[in-house]
UniProtKB/Swiss-Prot annotation:
Entry's family note: Belongs to the universal ribosomal protein uL16 family.
Pfam families associated with the record: Ribosomal_L16
Keywords recorded for this protein, A-Z: Ribonucleoprotein, Ribosomal protein, RNA-binding, rRNA-binding, tRNA-binding
Known partners and oligomeric status: Part of the 50S ribosomal subunit.
Ribosomal protein found in the keyword field: yes
CDD domains recorded: Ribosomal_L16_L10e (cd01433)
Role this protein plays: Binds 23S rRNA and is also seen to make contacts with the A and possibly P site tRNAs.
UniProt GO BP: translation
A GO term from the CC aspect: cytosolic large ribosomal subunit
Membrane-spanning ranges: none
Name the UniProt record assigns to this protein: Large ribosomal subunit protein uL16
Annotated signal sequence range: none
Gene3D superfamilies listed in its UniProt record: Ribosomal protein L10e/L16 (3.90.1170.10)
Length: 147
Protein backbone atom coordinates (compact mmCIF):
# COMPACT_ATOMS: atom_id res chain seq x y z
CA UNK A 1 0.00 0.00 0.00
CA UNK A 2 1.05 3.59 -0.57
CA UNK A 3 2.10 5.61 2.47
CA UNK A 4 4.80 8.16 3.31
CA UNK A 5 8.16 6.89 4.54
CA UNK A 6 8.50 9.71 7.08
CA UNK A 7 6.05 12.36 8.31
CA UNK A 8 6.54 15.57 10.26
CA UNK A 9 3.35 15.08 12.31
CA UNK A 10 1.96 11.63 13.12
CA UNK A 11 -1.63 12.82 13.56
CA UNK A 12 -3.40 15.61 11.65
CA UNK A 13 -6.81 17.27 11.85
CA UNK A 14 -9.54 16.27 9.41
CA UNK A 15 -9.81 19.61 7.62
CA UNK A 16 -12.33 20.78 5.00
CA UNK A 17 -12.41 20.31 1.24
CA UNK A 18 -13.39 23.64 -0.30
CA UNK A 19 -13.10 24.78 -3.91
CA UNK A 20 -11.56 23.16 -6.97
CA UNK A 21 -8.14 21.57 -7.38
CA UNK A 22 -5.46 24.11 -8.24
CA UNK A 23 -2.65 21.56 -8.59
CA UNK A 24 -2.59 18.29 -10.50
CA UNK A 25 -5.60 19.32 -12.57
CA UNK A 26 -4.13 18.69 -16.03
CA UNK A 27 -2.75 15.75 -18.01
CA UNK A 28 1.03 15.84 -17.61
CA UNK A 29 2.30 12.46 -18.87
CA UNK A 30 -0.28 10.27 -20.61
CA UNK A 31 -2.88 10.66 -23.36
CA UNK A 32 -5.96 9.65 -21.34
CA UNK A 33 -6.94 10.22 -17.71
CA UNK A 34 -9.71 10.09 -15.14
CA UNK A 35 -10.54 13.33 -13.41
CA UNK A 36 -12.50 13.71 -10.16
CA UNK A 37 -15.73 15.71 -10.44
CA UNK A 38 -16.42 15.81 -6.69
CA UNK A 39 -14.35 15.95 -3.52
CA UNK A 40 -13.49 13.12 -1.17
CA UNK A 41 -10.82 11.05 0.49
CA UNK A 42 -9.07 8.36 -1.53
CA UNK A 43 -7.53 5.63 0.65
CA UNK A 44 -4.37 3.75 -0.28
CA UNK A 45 -6.45 0.55 -0.66
CA UNK A 46 -8.80 2.24 -3.15
CA UNK A 47 -5.86 3.58 -5.19
CA UNK A 48 -4.33 0.09 -5.27
CA UNK A 49 -7.64 -1.55 -6.28
CA UNK A 50 -8.06 0.92 -9.16
CA UNK A 51 -4.44 0.37 -10.26
CA UNK A 52 -4.95 -3.40 -10.34
CA UNK A 53 -8.23 -3.04 -12.27
CA UNK A 54 -6.53 -0.90 -14.95
CA UNK A 55 -3.47 -3.16 -15.25
CA UNK A 56 -5.60 -6.30 -15.53
CA UNK A 57 -7.60 -4.80 -18.39
CA UNK A 58 -4.70 -3.34 -20.41
CA UNK A 59 -2.60 -6.49 -19.77
CA UNK A 60 0.95 -5.71 -20.88
CA UNK A 61 0.27 -2.72 -23.14
CA UNK A 62 0.48 0.90 -22.11
CA UNK A 63 1.93 2.85 -19.21
CA UNK A 64 0.01 3.98 -16.13
CA UNK A 65 0.75 6.98 -13.91
CA UNK A 66 -0.83 7.37 -10.46
CA UNK A 67 -1.19 11.12 -9.89
CA UNK A 68 -2.37 11.09 -6.25
CA UNK A 69 -0.50 10.03 -3.13
CA UNK A 70 -2.05 9.27 0.29
CA UNK A 71 -0.18 11.59 2.65
CA UNK A 72 -2.86 12.26 5.30
CA UNK A 73 -3.16 9.86 8.26
CA UNK A 74 -6.67 9.00 9.48
CA UNK A 75 -6.97 7.99 13.12
CA UNK A 76 -9.51 5.64 14.67
CA UNK A 77 -10.22 4.69 18.25
CA UNK A 78 -10.68 1.00 19.12
CA UNK A 79 -14.21 -0.44 19.16
CA UNK A 80 -16.20 -0.14 22.40
CA UNK A 81 -13.91 2.54 23.83
CA UNK A 82 -15.29 5.31 26.03
CA UNK A 83 -15.15 8.90 24.80
CA UNK A 84 -12.11 10.95 25.71
CA UNK A 85 -8.64 9.66 26.60
CA UNK A 86 -6.99 11.28 23.61
CA UNK A 87 -6.97 10.95 19.86
CA UNK A 88 -6.88 7.43 18.37
CA UNK A 89 -3.92 5.89 16.60
CA UNK A 90 -3.34 6.29 12.83
CA UNK A 91 -5.11 3.44 11.01
CA UNK A 92 -4.83 4.24 7.30
CA UNK A 93 -3.70 6.90 4.84
CA UNK A 94 -5.79 9.02 2.46
CA UNK A 95 -5.23 11.43 -0.40
CA UNK A 96 -7.44 14.53 -0.28
CA UNK A 97 -9.09 14.92 -3.70
CA UNK A 98 -10.88 18.06 -4.91
CA UNK A 99 -12.96 18.46 -8.09
CA UNK A 100 -10.74 18.70 -11.17
CA UNK A 101 -7.91 16.57 -9.80
CA UNK A 102 -6.46 14.07 -12.30
CA UNK A 103 -6.19 10.71 -10.53
CA UNK A 104 -4.71 8.31 -13.10
CA UNK A 105 -3.10 8.81 -16.51
CA UNK A 106 -2.65 6.21 -19.23
CA UNK A 107 -0.86 6.09 -22.59
CA UNK A 108 0.23 3.53 -25.17
CA UNK A 109 -3.22 1.97 -25.69
CA UNK A 110 -6.14 2.77 -28.05
CA UNK A 111 -8.83 5.14 -26.74
CA UNK A 112 -11.54 2.47 -26.46
CA UNK A 113 -9.24 0.27 -24.31
CA UNK A 114 -8.26 3.25 -22.14
CA UNK A 115 -11.91 4.29 -21.73
CA UNK A 116 -12.94 0.80 -20.55
CA UNK A 117 -9.91 0.44 -18.23
CA UNK A 118 -10.69 3.81 -16.64
CA UNK A 119 -14.38 2.87 -16.32
CA UNK A 120 -13.42 -0.29 -14.41
CA UNK A 121 -11.09 1.74 -12.18
CA UNK A 122 -13.75 4.38 -11.49
CA UNK A 123 -16.01 1.70 -9.98
CA UNK A 124 -13.35 1.20 -7.29
CA UNK A 125 -13.31 4.88 -6.34
CA UNK A 126 -15.60 6.63 -3.81
CA UNK A 127 -16.21 9.76 -5.92
CA UNK A 128 -17.66 10.59 -9.33
CA UNK A 129 -15.08 10.79 -12.11
CA UNK A 130 -14.97 11.52 -15.81
CA UNK A 131 -12.78 10.24 -18.63
CA UNK A 132 -10.69 12.96 -20.29
CA UNK A 133 -8.16 13.02 -23.13
CA UNK A 134 -5.23 15.29 -23.84
CA UNK A 135 -7.22 16.69 -26.78
CA UNK A 136 -10.05 17.73 -24.39
CA UNK A 137 -7.57 19.66 -22.26
CA UNK A 138 -6.17 21.52 -25.26
CA UNK A 139 -9.69 22.59 -26.29
CA UNK A 140 -11.29 23.41 -22.91
CA UNK A 141 -8.31 23.98 -20.64
CA UNK A 142 -9.37 21.09 -18.37
CA UNK A 143 -12.38 22.83 -16.84
CA UNK A 144 -14.49 20.55 -14.62
CA UNK A 145 -18.17 20.27 -15.54
CA UNK A 146 -20.42 18.44 -13.11
CA UNK A 147 -22.04 15.53 -14.99
Amino acid sequence: MLMPKKVKHRKVQRGRMKGKATRGNFIAYGDYAIQATECGWLTSNQIEAARIAINRYIKRGGKLWIKVFPDKPVTEKPAETRMGSGKGSPEYWVAVVKPGRVLFELSGVPENVAREAMRLASHKLPMKTKFVTRKDFEQTGGEVNEG
